[in-house]
């Protein structure tokens, strides 16, 4: 069954599915979204990960150490050229650390902004991820230091 919509709509749906399965912690679905060929991934602050094994291991590690994560995607832009598509977005992330052993309550929630580029390739099974690159959005120095004193 071929999904309805334009290529750009199908790529945007694949991009959304990527983040939704991360939120659910669905490793099998996440794995199915990636191509079988050589893939690459850069998480914020991580080195370049190359190859299906390294990339998928990184997501297994993230899922194992993140009790709660939610992505609010903004500034989503998709462009398609032939069998390759580029999706860029801002990941507005809300995540929670491990639960407190005594209370069982989720650790403090932390917000983070990441800009991401996801590269998709058209396959017989639909659009699949070829590369993901996420970079942290650093706070503007003017916002952090309103009095102009940069010596901390």
How does the language model describe each region?
Residues 1-33, 40-152:
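A beta-strand edge to alpha-helix "cap/lid" segment located at domain peripheries
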């Amino acid at each position: 069954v071929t999904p309805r919509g334009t290529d750009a709509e199908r790529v945007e749906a694949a991009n959304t599915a990527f983040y939704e399965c991360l939120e659910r912690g669905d490793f099998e679905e996440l794995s199915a979204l990636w191509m079988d060929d050589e893939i690459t991934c850069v998480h914020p602050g991580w080195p370049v990960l190359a190859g299906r094994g390294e990339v998928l291991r990184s997501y297994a590690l993230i899922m194992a150490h993140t009790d709660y994560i939610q992505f609010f995607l903004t500034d989503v832009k998709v462009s398609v050229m032939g069998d390759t598509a580029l999706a860029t977005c801002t990941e507005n992330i809300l995540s929670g650390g491990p639960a407190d052993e005594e209370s069982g309550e989720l650790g403090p929630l932390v917000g983070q902004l990441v800009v991401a580029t996801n590269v998709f390739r058209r396959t017989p099974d639909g659009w699949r991820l070829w590369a993901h690159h996420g970079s942290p959005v650093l706070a503007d120095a003017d916002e952090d230091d309103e009095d102009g004193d940069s010596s901390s």
